[in-house]
Each structure stands twice: as structure tokens, then as C-alpha cells.
């Protein structure tokens, strides 16, 4: 009997990759949702006996979706598929009723093993002939997927890997956003930063990276109001001063920049060499941190990730800027996702 399954993810790239990862012999009808609210509506329509659920989405995220499914006792088996691989993420979704958790990028063998545990799929010597074409048609019905969708999904996975490292280091839960990806003129970037200035001051670090025809700079902009709680998490009991704050800044930037750049490199199957970190400034307005940078290009692919830590006043922005010359190579490297 054909099983209706539902793939819920705000990324068209992720939905397509999830559909292509399904076992070839599984007799299914594949449906798609872009957020949790759409998924709930489709489950009510009988279109999701199995739900593959992302966590970080607009409108209704994965955690909220699981809460609704539990409250309404909806008839669906939920398998969370996410780039948020923090230990607490898996614990939380299992606690909310998910059957299992699988990390992005998806490992097909791991997915098959989980599906076998549900009892809704069993490998056979003679796979169903119509199943694979049906899955392929469903994936193709996602329509055209832009390069920016692919860039965003690569950033999403790398963001989760960096958050996992920070969460394990500090024994916290890192709140993750949806990465923002834009192609900007450098002048537009500077104007955008000035427009977002608030009453807080920032301290910043910059680190360059290069490899296989792709180059750029990573900026960590740390809210100065976050130093007190960060010192507490790092178990520093002394008086805060600029030297201590600089040490905390360098520690956090090493984790987030290093892990995020490594996560992107692994997905592109390349290796980046990283330069020495450079302190941009301490206790200044966000626009001033980047105003003195000698830009060597006119356009940039900008990826912005805003990290925060649950139950602590800790916020920092990771800004990855790829050079204009890197874009053709970057496009070629992510073409497999489209």
C-alpha cells in the first residue's frame, strides 16, 4: 500500500535532497511543506503518515510543530532531519514525541535503518518499480532552485556544526536562526551595518580564508553586553577588563569561525587555509568595526548568522564574506545540490 509521506523544510534544496535520499523501493506518495503550519494542515488532510521535519523554519518551527502534533494527537511518525546537531536538540525532539533524529547532510544508510525501525519500510530483493520514478517526479516538482537556496543550505549545516561545538564547550543550548544570504555591493553592506546600529557596542575579530579558488573573510561581531555572562560560562571569576574580554572574544571566534569554515569546506569537498585572526576593535559601534577594512573587491556574497545562547544574555553575529571572484567556483561546488 502506498504510504503518504511529508517532507517539511523551508529550504527547497533540503526538500529535494530529502526526497532523493528515500529508499528506491519504498512505495510512497511524496508531499512537501515549507513550514510547520503547512505540515499540520497537510497531516489533517491525510498527506503525512510519515513526517520528515526540519527544526529551523519561519512561521512555525520544528519544535512548535511537534508540540501541536502531540497536543492534537495527530497520526504521523515524525523523523526530525536537521543541521542543528547539538546534544540537547535530539533530546528535546525525542521528548516532544519524535520517533528519531537524523542530521544533515543525510546519510542514506542511516535513514534506511531508521525507516526499518518504524516498521513502515522493509528492504526487499525486488524493489517496487514505480517507487523510484515517483520520488524523482516529486523532487522535480519542487521547481527551479536558486544558487542562493543552495548557499543558504550549506550555511545552515555549517552553522549547526559550529553551534554544536560551542554548546559542548559551554554546556549550553545555542539558539539558531535561519542564515541570511545576499549578494551585495560593499557600499550596500556598510550601509546595512550602519542601519542596524543600536545602543550596544561591539568587539570584533576578522579572519581570512582561502582554498581551491574560493576566498573570503569571516567576521565575528560580539555584543559587549554579553561579556559578563560569557565570563561566567567560561568559569572566570576575576574582574573583567579589556584584556580578559579580548581573551574571551578570541576563544569564541576561534570556535565559531573555525567550525563554520570547516563545515562549509567539508560540504564543498575542499580545504581552506585560515589566516591569523585580527582584532578589529573593542567597544565600538558596529559600523566602525568594518569601516577601516581595506576591501579588495566591489561585490560580496554575504552570509549572516546571528547566534544567541538560551537563558543567557549572549549574542554574536558571524558574517562570512566571499570575494566576487569566488562566486563562479562556489556555484560549481554547490551545483550538486540543485
Question: Could you tell me what each predicted segment is?
Answer:
Residues 57:
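Receiver (REC) domain active-site loop signature in two-component systems and cognate sites
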Residues 32-41, 61-65:
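Helix N-cap/capping motif at the beta->alpha junctions
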Residues 47-52:
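Active-site beta3 strand of CheY-like receiver
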Residues 12-31, 71:
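Two-component/phosphorelay signaling modules centered on CheY-like receiver
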Residues 89, 124, 131-244, 249-338:
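Composition-driven recognition of glycine/serine/threonine/acidic- and proline-rich low-complexity segments
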Residues 104:
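A Lys-centered signature of the CheY-like receiver
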Amino acid at each position: 500500500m502506498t504510504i503518504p509521506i511529508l517532507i517539511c523544510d523551508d529550504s527547497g534544496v533540503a526538500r529535494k535532497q530529502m526526497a532523493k535520499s528515500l529508499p528506491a523501493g519504498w512505495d510512497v506518495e511524496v508531499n512537501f511543506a515549507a513550514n510547520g503550519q503547512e505540515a499540520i494542515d497537510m497531516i489533517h488532510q491525510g498527506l503525512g503518515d510519515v513526517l520528515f521535519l526540519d527544526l529551523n523554519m519561519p512561521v512555525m518551527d520544528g519544535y512548535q510543530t511537534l508540540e501541536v502534533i502531540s497536543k492534537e494527537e495527530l497520526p504521523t511518525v515524525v523523523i526530525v532531519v536537521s543541521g542543528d546537531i547539538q546534544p540537547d536538540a535530539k533530546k528535546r525532539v525525542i521528548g516532544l514525541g519524535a520517533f528519531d533524529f537524523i542530521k544533515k547532510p543525510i546519510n542514506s544508510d542511516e535513514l534506511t535503518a531508521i525507516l526499518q525501525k518504524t516498521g513502515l519500510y522493509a528492504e526487499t530483493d525486488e524493489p517496487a518499480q514505480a517507487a523510484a520514478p515517483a520520488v524523482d517526479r516529486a523532487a522535480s516538482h519542487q521547481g527551479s532552485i536558486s544558487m542562493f537556496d543552495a548557499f543558504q543550505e550549506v550555511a545552515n549545516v555549517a552553522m549547526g556544526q559550529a553551534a554544536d561545538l560551542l554548546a559542548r564547550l559551554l554546556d549550553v543550548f545555542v539558539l539558531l536562526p535561519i542564515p541570511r544570504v545576499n549578494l551585495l555591493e560593499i557600499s550596500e553592506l556598510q550601509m546595512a551595518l550602519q542601519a542596524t546600529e543600536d545602543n550596544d557596542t561591539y568587539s570584533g575579530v576578522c579572519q581570512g580564508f582561502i582554498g581551491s579558488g574560493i576566498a573570503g573573510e569571516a567576521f565575528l561581531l560580539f555584543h559587549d553586553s554579553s561579556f559578563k555572562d560569557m565570563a561566567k560560562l567560561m568559569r572566570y571569576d576575576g574582574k573583567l577588563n579589556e584584556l580578559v574580554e579580548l581573551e574571551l572574544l578570541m576563544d569564541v571566534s576561534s570556535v565559531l569561525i573555525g567550525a563554520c569554515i570547516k563545515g562549509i569546506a567539508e560540504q564543498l569537498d575542499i580545504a581552506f587555509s585560515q589566516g591569523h585572526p585580527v582584532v578589529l576593535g573593542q567597544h565600538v559601534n558596529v559600523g566602525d568595526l568594518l569601516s577601516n577594512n581595506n576591501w579588495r573587491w566591489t561585490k560580496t556574497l554575504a552570509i549572516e548568522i546571528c547566534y544567541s545562547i538560551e537563558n543567557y544574555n549572549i549574542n554574536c553575529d558571524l558574517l562570512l564574506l566571499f570575494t566576487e571572484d569566488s562566486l563562479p567556483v562556489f556555484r560549481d561546488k554547490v551545483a550538486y545540490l540543485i
